[in-house]
C-alpha cells in the first residue's frame, strides 16, 4: 500500500516531519519560512512555501482566510510538486495532516483536499486533524468548527484527534503538542505498517480503503499495548483499544459503520478464543456490524499491540462541544457587531457634509 503524507501549516508539518522520520513519503506546506526551516526530517526539496506574495513568508497568524488565499494562489505550484512525488505509481491514500485551530492548516487544507480529489479520483483523501486545546481560546475553536464543516463535504474521512483527551494535567501546551504529535504518528504508522504484511489473517489496502471511504464522516484511532507476560486478559486489552480510554476522540462507538482491528505480538500471547471474544463484542456494539481484522504473530515481539480504526462516525462529544461553542460565540459576535453598527449609525446620523458648513469656500479660493 502506498500512502503519501502532506502536512499543512505549523501543526501539520510537524506531524508530517515525524512520519518522514519513520520512512513515509511526506511533503510539508506552510506560509511560514521559519517553521519550514525548523523541520528535521523532510528534505528541503519537499518543503513548499506558499503565500509569500501575501504574507512574505511570515505565516498567517491563525487567520484561515489568509491561509485559504495562500493555498489558492500557489495551488498550481503545490500540485506540480505533488505530481513529481507521485510519479507513475498509484497512491492509495493521501493523508493530510493539519491543526484544526490554525490559519494555514484550517484555511488551506480544504482547498488542497478538493484539488487532490479532482486530480487523483482513484485515491482516497483522508484528513488527520488535531483539535485545539481548550486553553487556546475561542478563535481556534471557531476555526475548527468551520473547517470540520468544509472538510466533511470533500474528504473521504476525517480522523480527528482530540488533544484535550491526550494532554496530561501537568503538561504545558508546547510539551503536550510534541508528545501528542509523536503519539499520533506512532499509532497510525503502526496500523499502516501492518497493511499487506503476511500474517495469520491479514489486512490489505482494499480493507483499509473500504473502512476509510466513509463520505466525510469522522474516524478515530484506538490503541492499547502491554507486555505479553503481564497480560491477564487479551480480550480485555483488545476491548480497551476501542473503549473511551483507548480512543483519540470522544465518540459514541455505537454510531460507527465500520471497524478495523490489527493485533500484533508473540504467537503464544495471541489466543484465538480471546481475540474472537473481543471482536464479537465490537461487532455487536457498532451500528454497521462490519469489522475487518488482522492477526500478526511475531516471535520477535515481547509486547502485544492493538490498533483499532473506527469510521463512519456521526456522534462525537468532542466535535459537538467545538461546534456548539463556535456557534454560540458566532451568534454573540454577529449580534454585538450588528448592535455596534446600529449605535454608530444612530450616533452619526444627522451630521452635515463639509460643503454644508463651508458653502462657497472652494469657489472663493479658486
Swiss-Prot record:
CDD domains for the chain: CetZ_tubulin-like
UniProt feature coiled coil, ranges: none
Superkingdom per UniProt: Archaea
Keywords linked to the UniProt accession: Cell shape, Cytoplasm, GTP-binding, Nucleotide-binding
GTP-binding is among the record's keywords: yes
InterPro entries in the cross-refs: CetZ, CetZ_C, FtsZ/CetZ, Tubulin/FtsZ_GTPase_sf, Tubulin_CS, Tubulin_FtsZ_GTPase
Binding site for GTP: 10-14, 103-105, 136, 163, 181
Primary localization class, coarse: cytoplasm
Subcellular compartments: Cytoplasm
Signal peptide range in chain numbering: none
One of the GO BP terms on file: microtubule-based process
UniProt GO cellular component terms: cell division site; cytoplasm; microtubule
Molecular function terms from GO: GTP binding; GTPase activity
Ligase found in the keyword field: no
HAMAP family per UniProt: CetZ
Function summary: Involved in cell shape control.
Entry's family note: Belongs to the CetZ family.
Protein name: Tubulin-like protein CetZ
